[in-house]
Design a protein with these regions (language model features):
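Membrane-embedded alpha-helical bundles that constitute the cytochrome b-like, heme-associated redox core
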Residues: 1-252
Length: 252
């Protein structure tokens, strides 16, 4: 007869009865989010190779004061708060980096460091996570700028054309749009605090919006990761073309 432990080990960081490699759930998050953070920081401060022809890196969009008339630093630093704030306060990303970087907790049924007076997101600085719904509105504004950049990427010297960069930028803003509009805040905006859609003002429109946002919201994690890779690759591609490492292939 096999003895099966029935009591939990002493509560401490990493204590668990799990026998699987639970740390493999958070290791990719540390690598990807950490790597993206380093790359994005370097690119934001680089202040170079962010545009070529009709292409503009999403890290620098909208491009503000590139001639440094009143802002002496990288233009990317002016708009960083919008995309960064939206992702940093995102419900999914909060779960991901709380586990991966803060080990709070590291995984399901895995112990965390014992502490006193746990206050969660009710104390500074984590209480600022509650402004996520307002970052959503700001993110929608940035999506509009990025769609403008995507449309502009079809114009080469005033004539219609398609390059590899056109496809990269268009795919990127599509994935960013799916990530943005799959946000929990939009779903709550459409259907929150409602028990009866047909009784509410614009009930049918709100119900339709709620259904679509619910469908997208169920895939929010997928869109979060896909859009993270796409925005990083879009910037990387524009940089490589701008510095002459890559040659943009014209498809049309």
């Amino acid at each position: 007869m096999v003895d099966v432990p029935t009591s939990l080990p002493e509560s401490r960081l990493g204590s668990t009865l799990r026998r699987d490699a639970w740390w493999m759930e958070i290791l990719p998050v540390v690598i990807v989010l950490g790597g993206f953070g380093v790359y994005a920081t370097l690119r934001a401060f680089e202040n170079a190779y962010y545009s070529w022809g009709p292409y503009l890196s999403p890290f620098y969009s909208p491009l503000i004061d590139p001639q440094h008339h009143w802002w002496p630093f990288s233009p990317a630093l002016l708009i960083l708060v919008g995309p960064l704030g939206f992702r940093a306060t995102c419900y999914y990303y909060r779960k991901a980096y709380y586990r991966a970087f803060f080990l709070d907790p590291p995984a399901c049924a895995v112990g965390e460091s014992p502490r006193r007076n746990y206050r969660g997101e009710t104390a500074f600085p984590f209480i600022l996570q509650n402004v996520h719904r307002y970052f959503f509105y700001l993110a929608v504004l940035f999506i509009c700028f990025l769609w403008y950049d995507a449309v502009r990427s079809f114009l080469f010297d005033g004539h219609f054309g398609i390059g590899v960069g056109t496809l990269v930028l268009t795919l990127n803003v599509t994935l960013l749009s799916l990530y943005t509009f799959s946000c929990h805040s939009l779903r709550h905006l459409a259907g929150g605090k409602l028990d009866c859609f047909s009784c509410a003002t614009f009930g049918r429109s709100r119900f339709a919006t709620w259904r679509v946002s619910t469908f997208l919201n169920e895939r929010h994690m997928l869109f979060a990761w896909c859009s993270l890779f796409s925005v990083g690759f879009a910037d990387f591609y524009v940089r490589m073309v701008a510095c002459g490492t890559f040659r943009d292939l014209r498809l049309l």
